[in-house]
Structure formats: structure tokens, C-alpha cells
Amino acid sequence: MDAATAPKQAWLPWSPLLFLLLLPGGSISSCPTVCDCTSQTRAVFCAHRRLDTIPGGLPLDTELLDLSGNRLWGLQRGMLSRLGQLQELDLSYNQLSTLEPGAFHGLQSLLTLRLQGNRLRIVGPGIFSGLTALTLLDLRLNQIVLFLDGAFSELGSLQQLEVGDNHLVFVAPGAFAGLAKLSTITLERCNLSTVPGLALAQLPALVALRLRELDIERLPAGALRGLGQLKELEIHHWPSLEALDPGSLVGLNLSSLAITRCNLSSVPFQALHHLSFLRILDLSQNPISAIPARRLSPLVRLQELRLSGACLTSIAAHAFHGLTAFHLLDVADNALQTLEETAFPSPDKLVTLRLSGNPLTCDCRLLWLLRLRRRLDFGTSPPACAGPQHVQGKSLREFSDILPPGHFTCKPALIRKSGPRWVIAEEGGHAVFSCSGDGDPAPTVSWMRPQGAWLGRVGRVRVLEDGTLEIRSVQLRDRGAYVCVVSNVAGNDSLRTWLEVIQVEPPNGTLSDPNITMPGIPGPFFLDSRGVAMVLAVGFLPFLTSVTLCFGLIALWSKGKGRVKHHMTFDFVAPRPSGDKNSGGNRVTAKLF
């Protein structure tokens, strides 16, 4: 070893230690004693350490900092400004009540900020300044009551905002201004009484909107009109929502709509009819009792319908006709006794059918389901029979391909009991026809009027729930034959009855229409041919009697005068000519005939 190299070799073993000592404070080699650090992931974990201030000496290249579950009460401006590489900051479940404007200044790389479970009350402008790269902000479980105008104006990269479980009562119209990339927002368990439509209209890139557990009674027409890019809308647990206004979804072009655990009593067809691109519809846990025929046909691209945990008792034939892409139906946990093949446009295209939890009657109406049982996805619980008794509790998957006699059969409908086949009623009276039938499954009763039209459940002439035909305020035009038809899936039977109507004249003897009356105003006077004949008779008979009486009196008078002379003589005095002064008078004799 020469003198030139000796000094160099002497300090080389100490060079790494010297390098670390010369690094500025807070490098990755340092870690606060109250925290745990990992150099591989550049993460610092200081959660649940009862800290009331942010510890010093944090590594400058930290990318994840977890300070959750401590006692932090506030953040001052620039407190974290040295952590320029920080990407995720968790401040959840502290006691933060104030965030000074500029508190996050210098965190230009931060992507995720979690502030849930604190005591924040008002979010105003400037609080989140400097967070130009932030994509997720979680403000749940605070005490926030107001979002002021411009509260998030500097978060131009924000894509997801969570603000549930707050005391939120008002969202200023410009609160969400500047959130040009926000794609998802969740408002849940707040005190909002209306949907903040004006504020939401400031979100041009919003794709998913979740409105959960809100005490809002209605979604007014046009409330979400400005959200043309919205694809997913979730309305969950609005106990006061009983119906959707027809125009409540106007302006939307949704592909997924969920209105669950509300109080809808029927499918809101009028509000849905324009959603031609809707693929998924979830109306589960609503008191909906029926799906009528063809009302879903405007939703031509609908693929999935979920209506589990509702009150469904019937799904009509042709209920899903017009839905050429339909492949999933979830109606588990309802009150359905059957599901007929005719409800679907093409049962073979059905992939998933959730039907468990229904009191199914395993008769001929479910033979199609038995045929497809090995191909269909029934989920974790396949449907089971609730009746007849000999198959009660048996899953559809347990049946063999060759059925024993008496399994999955039906009996055609037959009329067993009916009232009089000929009924006579007075005009303005009341007429009733009874009709019932037997069969398996139990048949339905329908009535056809004389003109050939089927009668409904409402109106002056209506069919009651028990199949009875009731005609109130009988009119002359109600006269004719009425046909009772009892039918089920196995067949039908019919019975012809007749109604005869007796016309009743008003007390004043006129034949005016008794149906046209107004209090205090006399109605118009109309006569039919019989009335005209009566009027003519009443006028002609007195006239004829008077003329006959006159001629009779004249005849009696003439007989009282004796023999009648048939000639008479009278003098005729002609004009005297000017030249004849002695001419006398002329006598003329005329005969009376």
C-alpha cells in the first residue's frame, strides 16, 4: 500500500454511513418511533396510536400515510407540504373539525384522501386547494350540513366522491362546479328533502349516481335532466317513495336502473318507457303485486329484471314479449303460484331464473320449467313445489325425465254453478248474473257483452271478483245475450244468458229520456213513434167527435122544421132600359137541390 492510496482505503468502509448521515431529515431511512414503515411499498402506518398531532420525521418519499383512528383535531396550512410524493392519505376516524384553506397544499401527487368519521360541518371553497391529481374523496360519517358554492372547484381530476352519513340539508347549486371528471357520487343517509338537481347538473361526466336511504317523497319531473351521460342510477331505501312521476327520468339515457326497498306498488311503466337502452332493471323489495302483459316492451334492450322480495302474485302471459335480449329473471321470495311459459318471448333463451321462495303449484303450467331444469341457472336454491300434496317440498331438480301418473297435470275448466239464464229487469233497475266453474288450476271467469266486447272490473256494467256480472242503472241498450266464459290453461267452458229490459214511462206521461236530467233545468222532450201516435190520437178523436155532434144537431133541427121545400120563388128586378119606361118586373123560379 502506497501513501497515495492509504487515505482512500481508510474512509471507504465508512462511506455508506456517512452518506446516510448527510441525507436531509425525513428521508426514507428515518421513521417516527410511533409508526411502522415499509421501504418496499413506501408506506407509513400510524393508525390507532392516540396521536393528537402529525408526527415529525416522516420519510419524504412516502406514498401511503395511514393516520386513521387517532385524535387529530385540525390541519393547518402546509402541515404536509413536504410529502410531495404522497399518493394516499388516510385521516379517517379522527376528531377533525376544521380544515384550514391550503391544508393539503403541496400534495400535488395525492390520488386518494379519506376523511370519513370526523366532525367536519361545512365544506367551503379553498379547503382542497392544491389537490390537482385527487381521484377519490371520502367524506362519509361526518357532521356536514352544507356544501357551499365552489367547495370542490379545484378538484378537476376527482372521479369518485362519497358523502354519505352526514347531516346534509343543503347543496348549493354551484357546489360541484369544476368537477369535470367526476364519474361516481354517492349521497346516502342525509337529511336532504329533495334531490339537488341543480348541483348535480354541474357534473358533465357523471356516470353513476347512488341515492341511498333518503327521506324523499318524490322524484319530480326533470330532476335529473342535466345528466345526459349518466348510465347507472340507484335509488335505495326511500320509504316515502310510492310512485315515480311520468317525467322524473326525462333526459336520462340509462343502462342500469335500481329502485329498491322503496314503496312502489306497481312497475312505473310511464317513467321508464323512453329508456330504450336500459339493460338492467332492479325493482326488488317493493310491494309490487303483478307484471301485466307487454308493458315492458318499450325497453327493447332489457336483459335483466330483478324483482325479488316483493309481493308478486302473478306474471301475465306475454309479460316479457318484445324483449328479444331478455335472459335473466329474479323473482325469488314472492307469492307466485306459477310462472307460465307464455310469459317469455323465447323461453329457450332464458339463462338465469331465480324462483326460490315462491309457493309454486307443480301442475301442467310448469312442465316447460321441468324440461329446462338442467340448463337453467337457478342459483344456490332451485325452486320447489308447494303443492299438490304428493310433491310438496320436492325440488324441480329431483324429478326424473319420466313422470309418474298424476304429476304435473291439469283439469279443464267446467261451469258448475250459475244463476238464472233469463233475467228481466226494469229500466233504471239492477241486474245480476252469477257464474262459476271448477278446474285445476282454478279457472278465471270472464263475461262478454252483446256487442262482442269483453267486460272489465269497473264501470256501470262490470265483473265482480267472484265472477258475478253486475249491471247497475239498467238501460234499454243493455238488452241482449251475455256470455260467461270460464277458462284455465287446460280448457274453457261457456254459458249464454239473456237480459230483457222493460221500459218504464216517467210519472208525467211523457216519454222523454230519463237519463238526461239536470237539477232545476227541464230536459229536452223527445217522442218515439208510439208517442207520436198517441199524440195524434188524442188530438183527432175530440175533433171527430165535435164534427159528428154538430152534424147531428143540424139534422135534428131540420127535422123539427117540417117538410123541406125544394124550390123557391123570388122577384128579380132587372135594370130599366133608358128607352122603356113602362116595362114591369120579372119573376124567376129556382129549384133547390
From Swiss-Prot:
SUPFAM superfamilies the UniProt entry points to: Immunoglobulin (SSF48726), L domain-like (SSF52058)
Cysteine disulfide links: 435-484
The keyword Disulfide bond is assigned to this record: yes
LRRCT domain sequence ranges: 358-412
Membrane-crossing residue ranges in chain numbering: 534-554
Keyword Repeat appears in the UniProt entry: yes
Cross-referenced SMART domains: IG (SM00409), IGc2 (SM00408), LRR_TYP (SM00369), LRRCT (SM00082), LRRNT (SM00013)
Residue intervals on the Extracellular side: 30-533
Compartment(s) of residence: Membrane
InterPro entries referenced in this protein's UniProt entry, alphabetically: Cys-rich_flank_reg_C, Ig-like_dom, Ig-like_dom_sf, Ig-like_fold, Ig_I-set, Ig_sub, Ig_sub2, Leu-rich_rpt
Keywords annotated in UniProt: Disulfide bond, Glycoprotein, Immunoglobulin domain, Leucine-rich repeat, Membrane, Repeat, Signal, Transmembrane, Transmembrane helix
Record-given protein name: Leucine-rich repeat and immunoglobulin-like domain containing-NOGO receptor-interacting protein 4
Organism annotation: Mus musculus (Mouse)
Lineage: Eukaryota, Metazoa, Chordata, Craniata, Vertebrata
